[in-house]
Amino acid sequence: MSNPQPDDSNNRIVAVTLDEESIGRSGPDIEHERAIAIYDLVEKNLFAPEGAGEGPFTLHIGITGSRLMFDIRREDGTPVVAHLLSLSPFRRIVKDYFMICDSYYQAIRTATPDKIEAIDMGRRGIHDEGSRTLQERLAGKVRIDFETARRLFTLISVLHWKG
């Protein structure tokens, strides 16, 4: 006999905002990636802050000093919890991610399909590493699935680039 799984249909993010003070000027490729990540995140995600009960939730992401801030609220704006995470574990990953993204965006304009595919595989690998790191940093604080972690990592990368 298996244990029933919790109903996660309400454990999700319904709105995401990024701290405008934390966002640096980005090129159109990065802005496009950010918009897609927000759209995809809101469309499909698993986000369950520990001890918060059921959602849905809103999430405001920003950089405060050298920390990543997740300000989690209920849909009506009632505060749930704010988590501050050190940016140190993300610095190298984000730097590598942006370097390979630059290579990828240059390659899609001029390189062969094989070269583009090789760069894209590397880009996805670094993105996966950042996503796993985020899941580890949120363990015991917020339960998220891997796809949610991937979309959140994209947004963190945009913020961290300025920080």
Swiss-Prot record:
It holds the Pfam family UPF0262. It comes from the Bacteria. Belongs to the UPF0262 family. NCBIfam families: PRK02853.1. This is UPF0262 protein RPB_4349.
